[in-house]
């Protein structure tokens, strides 16, 4: 997912008002462990391999870069596995010279809410550091990584893509293309084959796949189809059979309910009205927006609190300037105000689409849990943890309260979907809990306070 380098200043003002500089100086850096002597239980962690998508790769802040890779949950887990006999963990890191990787976004100052002009420089796009060329579609291809790899996370990959020939070609997924040899014969390698080729000697695995089969539907307002459950099941069964060959143990993580993330919960009708006021002070508050909706008999209706406006609506700098105009959209009526000229579906996940998404995610997780149980694997339900994060009181650990709030909640990064280092540490602890419960191990947890949240950077 790519993000514009500027936010509408009115939105950022409303989001960052009250943002305080935080430190962890008052937190015990040794907190978060059980105190039990580390032991491996019935599992063997001597060679760990991680399979998954962007969350596994360490994607954050709208990009993949060296620091985000170093704070990936597999790297955090591998560090804890060393206390129970785990070995070195090799990731496909961008070099220090190309540390910016694919590029990312960062917060460079706390804006002065009394001076909106300062907000124009509050968000900065960091230029990519590892682009070697562009493909025929004009998309960036990254500097190749060669050699041993134990973090097989590929941003953007779906369960539906596991057996797709050409997925790692220059016209395919650039994050996967980066991992394959720079020879023509490698272009037909599927992700399933790549995983198979990197399992030699592996004694333990984690597998977090399936997120993008739901996420791409959600972030496009239902435009991109959901993966069919039958295909999801077929491909996942093949992957599980491969990963558990020879009795290999591991942990499976379920598909999160993405609609609790800031990407879907930050923009409300009240927020939109505040921004419109900044753009046009004479405009009265809108009681609702006119939206395209899958559950509307005529294709459009007034928005309700159960419809979710996407962060992309604000990240598109020109979108809000269209509100009320009659020369954009269908050009029949006022844009986003009259039902004859509704806000396009790609900017809203309507209530009907939310219900469809939730049903499919539940189906996906049933498939994952059934496979984990059948194979005797540890299973993590991420939604138990995320529900705590999204609750009114958030999740308190070691003196810090974490929430799902955008920028200030501590869990989600600048892109509103992927995690901060602290968020990845929290997830790592949930995975460790599940592993310990399943295999009788006593792997120590990490202290999330030792990992940073959204930072102000120069």
Q: Model-found features: residue ranges?
A:
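Bacterial N-terminal signal peptides that target proteins for export
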Residues: 1-10
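Conserved active-site regions of diverse hydrolases
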Residues: 23-458
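C-terminal motif of bacterial Sec signal peptides marking the signal peptidase cleavage site
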Residues: 18-21
